[in-house]
């Protein structure tokens, strides 16, 4: 057998948000490496009964690479399960570099991000015509510094939708930097804790209430914050489905008078969406 490493995105938590390809990759594993602190144990139900299961929360990169070397020697399939999508804050590239040096075949299987899961949970689109057409994935600088130009204040100047990972442990600083970057105090926010897990908590609030909301939830880890005017915009429509818009599959139509609806941003108060 030829060794291979399968990097699998487990999604935000709920096992039924695994993709079919992810399920098949877990079922094919001789060795499963997963982080019990980040991934719900239900995903292991798809692993073979005789698979070796290793919890990566106590492992270093060197420990993981030792497993990969053993896989090469013994022709094993290792399924490395990451939370969310492996390409976003997954510490995956350092593994890929090492696997390439070892000459082991690998595959990346994408997963549902916590950003998508949180937006779905509150019933919002993150890219609204005339309001926001970009989504910034970022985090606050902590023990791991940010590159030049990627401080939170710098990115907040764009005023578009922002998804903040790994930032809930410093709520006062988070709120301050977003405000200083240019978001208005009434900018809508969503705080999502362990979204799609049985104990998920999701709360909406204004930006000037963000720090107090996070403190009230008493969350520091497993928390995503969404910020931006698109989170409470309504009354817009896309050009793509406008009668006045012609494209490859449909000509423009005469009923174009009602094609444009101005954007309206609602006021947003603190609201528990689910608990």
Model segments located where?
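Class I S-adenosyl-L-methionine
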Residues: 1-112, 117, 211, 275
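Class I SAM-dependent methyltransferase SAM-binding "motif I" and its flanking Rossmann-like core
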Residues: 3, 14, 85-158, 201-204, ...
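A contiguous loop/helix-start segment that scaffolds small-molecule binding in enzyme catalytic cores
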Residues: 4-7, 63, 74-78, 97, ...
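Short secondary-structure boundary/capping segments
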Residues: 23, 45, 70, 127-128, ...
């Amino acid at each position: 057998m030829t060794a291979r490493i399968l990097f699998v995105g487990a999604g935000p938590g709920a096992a039924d948000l695994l993709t079919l390809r992810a399920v098949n990759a877990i079922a094919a594993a001789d060795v499963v490496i997963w982080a019990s602190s980040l991934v719900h144990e239900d995903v292991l139900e798809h692993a073979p009964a005789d698979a070796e299961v290793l919890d990566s929360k106590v492992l270093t990169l060197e420990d993981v690479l030792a497993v990969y070397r053993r896989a090469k020697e013994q022709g094993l399939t290792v399924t490395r399960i990451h939370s969310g999508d492996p390409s976003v804050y997954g510490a995956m590239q350092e593994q890929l570099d090492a696997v390439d040096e070892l000459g082991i075949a690998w595959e990346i299987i994408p997963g549902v991000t916590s950003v998508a899961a949180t937006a779905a949970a509150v019933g919002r689109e993150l890219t609204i015509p005339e309001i926001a057409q970009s989504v910034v994935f970022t985090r606050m600088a902590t023990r791991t510094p940010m590159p030049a130009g990627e401080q939170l204040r710098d990115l907040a100047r764009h005023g578009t939708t922002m998804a903040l990972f790994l930032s809930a442990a410093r709520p006062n600083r988070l709120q301050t930097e977003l405000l200083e970057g240019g978001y208005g105090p009434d900018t809508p926010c969503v705080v999502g804790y362990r979204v799609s897990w049985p104990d998920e908590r999701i709360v909406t609030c204004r930006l000037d209430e963000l720090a107090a909301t996070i403190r009230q939830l008493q969350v520091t880890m497993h928390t995503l914050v969404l910020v931006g005017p698109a989170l409470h915009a309504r009354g817009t429509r896309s050009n793509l489905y406008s009668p006045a818009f012609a494209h490859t599959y449909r000509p423009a139509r005469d009923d174009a008078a009602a094609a444009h609806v101005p954007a309206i941003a609602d006021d947003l108060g603190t609201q528990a969406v689910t608990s």
